[in-house]
From Swiss-Prot:
Gene: tolB
GO CC annotations on file: periplasmic space
Annotated signal peptide: 1-17
Phylogenetic classification of the source organism: Bacteria, Pseudomonadati, Campylobacterota, Epsilonproteobacteria, Campylobacterales
Keyword Methyltransferase attached: no
Annotated source species: Campylobacter jejuni (strain RM1221)
Protein name as catalogued: Tol-Pal system protein TolB
Localization: Periplasm
Entry superkingdom: Bacteria
Amino acid sequence: MKKIVAIFLVFLGSLWAEDPVIDVVNSGVVLPKIIVKDNSNLSDENLKKSFYNIIVNDLKVSSNFEVVANATETSNYTFEYTLNKNGNTLSLNVKIKAGGSDKSEQTYTLNGLEQYPFLAHKSVKASVNALGLAPVDWMDHKILIARNSSSKKSQIIMADYTLTYQKVIVDGGLNLFPKWGNKEQTLFYYTAYDHDKPTLYRYDLNTNKASKILSSGGMVVASDVSVDGSKLLVTMAPKDQPDVYLYDLNTKNLTQLTNYSGIDVNGNFIGSDDSKVVFVSDRLGYPNIFMQDLNSNSAEQVVFHGRNNSAVSTYKDFLVYSSREPNQAGVFNIYLMSINSDYIRQLTANGKNLFPRFSSDGGSIVFIKYLGAQSALGVIRVNANKTFYFPLRVGKIQSIDW
């Protein structure tokens, strides 16, 4: 069990954020300039400042604009907005101008003051789409984080990608490995203990209720969900021997996919039709990534780089993984590759870069970075070749999902 824990609980970090602060690397492309104009007349100065900061940061992270403070509206884009607050309700009007001419106007309403970061994210996402620029549909998606709250206890929280919004969803006991269950993000799976037995639960955010899916001795973790949401890839160890299983939520049928005397964990669907699975195995004597068809028990090595590849996430034919660098003590970098090509792209350069997760459109990757005594949530904009960092503080991270 110690080896199992070593693979799943790779490293612990810290979590908390005030107004998001962006650090950007790999910049240099000339982008169109955009001015942000806040016409709000709010008495809540903290909300006013925080909302403005999020809008500015979202525009930067979109990698479509260079945000400028002093420029003429007649020759640049303008993001002009008015935010109003009425009790616990927010209303937002956004006008996008190009060269002084209106390009789009949208009005939004949000019931739930604490969720204001998502209102900002949604408005930037819609504005980018209205201008026909590279989409950022992932921007208003939620992140699930399991974090240690005390000895042998952990919480599952839901957050926006800047970590400005955080809400505890599951508390009490040991709650681990949250995994979104559908693209609408209305439910997720997680592992907890029922009378000291590892149990997989499904949590419905519409009803705020958890239901039991299945239990297993040793461990049970949902590592991936099929595109249609009907099947789970589950790591189970009923005889203290972790293997990857396929669980059909409709038929309740459980199929063992791997059968190796060592460790097979963290299965992820890969391919456009979810017909293959990649997983982490120690069958070479160290953690590495393998692949096999769902209807076959023959596994093939996928990654031929590094000697400790213990985290993986997939999008269609692509996979992203964290790899320990040889001859660099404690350094883990994130790499991107396709199962249809030998090309490997290094995405990070130093420190410990862990928990990589693809966005819903595959164009971005979120991860946790540790560098010395500092830690941050990183967002890699793959096509723009940019990485943005948001500071993390307080609370140890056990796992994340996006």
